[in-house]
Amino acid sequence: MGRTVVVLGGGISGLAASYHLSRAPCPPKVVLVESSERLGGWIRSVRGPNGAIFELGPRGIRPAGALGARTLLLVSELGLDSEVLPVRGDHPAAQNRFLYVGGALHALPTGLRGLLRPSPPFSKPLFWAGLRELTKPRGKEPDETVHSFAQRRLGPEVASLAMDSLCRGVFAGNSRELSIRSCFPSLFQAEQTHRSILLGLLLGAGRTPQPDSALIRQALAERWSQWSLRGGLEMLPQALETHLTSRGVSVLRGQPVCGLSLQAEGRWKVSLRDSSLEADHVISAIPASVLSELLPAEAAPLARALSAITAVSVAVVNLQYQGAHLPVQGFGHLVPSSEDPGVLGIVYDSVAFPEQDGSPPGLRVTVMLGGSWLQTLEASGCVLSQELFQQRAQEAAATQLGLKEMPSHCLVHLHKNCIPQYTLGHWQKLESARQFLTAHRLPLTLAGASYEGVAVNDCIESGRQAAVSVLGTEPNS
């Protein structure tokens, strides 16, 4: 009788793990268990009354590097090439990004000319920060906060404006708490290997082999900065679900896992609400803190390490305006915590993907709310109403982008505990978990955003690596 692998979590990580397991030459029996009634996790696309697409979660995927190429290969394998909407390298959404500081939008400098000129909100040309960076000695600590690292190497302005904003935009987190080693490993490794971020990025970490396809070659030739799908990014998990069903994968929806226990023969018993499953191996693609509550008593050290990986909430407010125009053209802007602790940033959806504006077309923007403002609200126990978030988002759009009219359409979603926080020492939590799994030979593999990357590409790769670990070899296509 063949092996049974149970995959916990039907987000993009669990779907990717199930996909690669199902494509093995002799695939195991795969059962995908999802607590909610839908698959895709935080990837969710909604069509508005005029046909416009609103992304409630991720809205674009970067094609760069080996991970970006592997995701494009997955898109091709699923037959979605004709649905891809690329943002090419010469597009304003690829070239222009902004910071909102001092009540005004400031374009981030690009190219050598931009680095040599004074560029508000920075008081000096960023060239000088780069020159300073080349002279700084290598850090001696095994980890450091993003703020400390950036301030030490690039100066206080870059730390408090650029890196603070970047941490809010990517992790909805605090740069004074997040780990440089885990959040931005390429920067950490560049300093460790080459003593300098700039030298490390210029010299690179060596070429990583990446797959090849017509879509990957097109993305390279046209220098895509990001891409989406015509009907929204949720087309990707939907196509994965269709593929899994065709491959005989059992998909259980609306089935929260109540507990995991080890049987005498070393197999798992996966307890569901009204039934149970037996598995030779479990891939967990659910949040680390959730998994920690399901583990048996004999895995208490593992549960402790996983429970320490926390996550923060983000309110996503999609707004559409008829007849309105943006003051600038670009991807969007980020807001440092010193400017507005509640508004993380605003994405100019219509600039990158006008094909999704609907008919008649309307200007779409997405306001991300979170940070210390939202954490304080959550801790106070006050009612987090849709009206509160909509008002806050409309005020931000009016103040920061001049969109003072009432939106024609608005969607508000509070994503509770959606972005894991890789705080200082995160790598030690991962090491503790790995050591326990190895020492006790537990048939359990960890995947998902809780561990080594929160972006869609990271999650898909995490699922693929989990499948490779279980199979012991790369699955055939």
Curated annotation (Swiss-Prot):
<feature type="binding site">
    <location>
        <begin position="57"/>
        <end position="60"/>
    </location>
    <ligand>
        <name>FAD</name>
    </ligand>
</feature>
<dbReference type="GO" id="GO:0006785">
    <property type="term" value="P:heme B biosynthetic process"/>
</dbReference>
<feature type="binding site">
    <location>
        <position position="449"/>
    </location>
    <ligand>
        <name>FAD</name>
    </ligand>
</feature>
<keyword id="KW-0285">Flavoprotein</keyword>
<keyword id="KW-0350">Heme biosynthesis</keyword>
<dbReference type="GO" id="GO:0005758">
    <property type="term" value="C:mitochondrial intermembrane space"/>
</dbReference>
<dbReference type="InterPro" id="IPR004572">
    <property type="entry name" value="Protoporphyrinogen_oxidase"/>
</dbReference>
<dbReference type="GO" id="GO:0006779">
    <property type="term" value="P:porphyrin-containing compound biosynthetic process"/>
</dbReference>
<feature type="binding site">
    <location>
        <begin position="34"/>
        <end position="35"/>
    </location>
    <ligand>
        <name>FAD</name>
    </ligand>
</feature>
<protein>
    <recommendedName>
        <fullName>Protoporphyrinogen oxidase</fullName>
        <ecNumber>1.3.3.4</ecNumber>
    </recommendedName>
</protein>
<feature type="binding site">
    <location>
        <position position="257"/>
    </location>
    <ligand>
        <name>FAD</name>
    </ligand>
</feature>
<keyword id="KW-0274">FAD</keyword>
<keyword id="KW-0472">Membrane</keyword>
<dbReference type="InterPro" id="IPR036188">
    <property type="entry name" value="FAD/NAD-bd_sf"/>
</dbReference>
<feature type="binding site">
    <location>
        <position position="42"/>
    </location>
    <ligand>
        <name>FAD</name>
    </ligand>
</feature>
<comment type="similarity">
    <text>Belongs to the protoporphyrinogen/coproporphyrinogen oxidase family. Protoporphyrinogen oxidase subfamily.</text>
</comment>
<feature type="binding site">
    <location>
        <begin position="9"/>
        <end position="14"/>
    </location>
    <ligand>
        <name>FAD</name>
    </ligand>
</feature>
<dbReference type="GO" id="GO:0006782">
    <property type="term" value="P:protoporphyrinogen IX biosynthetic process"/>
</dbReference>
<keyword id="KW-0999">Mitochondrion inner membrane</keyword>
<comment type="function">
    <text>Catalyzes the 6-electron oxidation of protoporphyrinogen-IX to form protoporphyrin-IX.</text>
</comment>
<dbReference type="GO" id="GO:0005743">
    <property type="term" value="C:mitochondrial inner membrane"/>
</dbReference>
<dbReference type="GO" id="GO:0004729">
    <property type="term" value="F:oxygen-dependent protoporphyrinogen oxidase activity"/>
</dbReference>
<keyword id="KW-0496">Mitochondrion</keyword>
<keyword id="KW-0627">Porphyrin biosynthesis</keyword>
<dbReference type="Pfam" id="PF01593">
    <property type="entry name" value="Amino_oxidase"/>
</dbReference>
<dbReference type="GO" id="GO:0006784">
    <property type="term" value="P:heme A biosynthetic process"/>
</dbReference>
<dbReference type="GO" id="GO:0006783">
    <property type="term" value="P:heme biosynthetic process"/>
</dbReference>
<keyword id="KW-0225">Disease variant</keyword>
<dbReference type="GO" id="GO:0031966">
    <property type="term" value="C:mitochondrial membrane"/>
</dbReference>
<feature type="binding site">
    <location>
        <begin position="454"/>
        <end position="456"/>
    </location>
    <ligand>
        <name>FAD</name>
    </ligand>
</feature>
<dbReference type="GO" id="GO:0005739">
    <property type="term" value="C:mitochondrion"/>
</dbReference>
<dbReference type="GO" id="GO:0009410">
    <property type="term" value="P:response to xenobiotic stimulus"/>
</dbReference>
<keyword id="KW-0560">Oxidoreductase</keyword>
<dbReference type="InterPro" id="IPR002937">
    <property type="entry name" value="Amino_oxidase"/>
</dbReference>
<dbReference type="InterPro" id="IPR050464">
    <property type="entry name" value="Zeta_carotene_desat/Oxidored"/>
</dbReference>
<dbReference type="GO" id="GO:0050660">
    <property type="term" value="F:flavin adenine dinucleotide binding"/>
</dbReference>
<comment type="pathway">
    <text>Porphyrin-containing compound metabolism; protoporphyrin-IX biosynthesis; protoporphyrin-IX from protoporphyrinogen-IX: step 1/1.</text>
</comment>
<comment type="subunit">
    <text>Monomer. Homodimer.</text>
</comment>
<dbReference type="GO" id="GO:0048034">
    <property type="term" value="P:heme O biosynthetic process"/>
</dbReference>
